Amino acid sequence: MATKTSVVDRLRSRIGAASPPISATVEAGHLKRFAEAIGDPNPRWLNEAPPTYLVALVSVSIHLAEAEEYGKGWLNGGNRFEYMEPVMAGDHITATGKIADVYEKTGSSGTLLFIIFETGYVNQHGRTVARVRGTAIRR
């Protein structure tokens, strides 16, 4: 089994490396069902994507086998969404992610591994429509 230090070093070596792009088309029916699922009846969401929709539309996978060796259990440390323009039904969205930072923090329950992700979302016109920055925590 790898040491925690070697796991952190391997993850840090991947900072900035882009994931393979993944694409999907925003469908009006999916927007409606997503709005129903989050309990938001605003008719705006019949044609425009609600704020967290993109994460459900195209989930970027950054393989983190190294982190599995660090410990057990994942925690979601939160996400920050930044929108540059609305995402509408019919838009074709391509997402690419990367590891932005990796660090450890020691607290009362022990040492935790923090992995910061950034994902960019581009529409069919080549314009960046949104960015998401998230934190995954491994115990």
Say what each PLM segment does.
Residues 1-78:
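Hot-dog-fold acyl-thioester-processing enzymes
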Residues 1-6, 10, 86-139:
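HotDog/MaoC-like acyl-thioester-processing domains
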Residues 23-25, 80-82, 135-137:
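Generic structural detector for well-ordered beta-strands
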Residues 34, 45, 53, 81-83, ...:
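Aromatic side chains
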Residues 68-91, 95:
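Mid-chain, well-packed structural core segment of small domains
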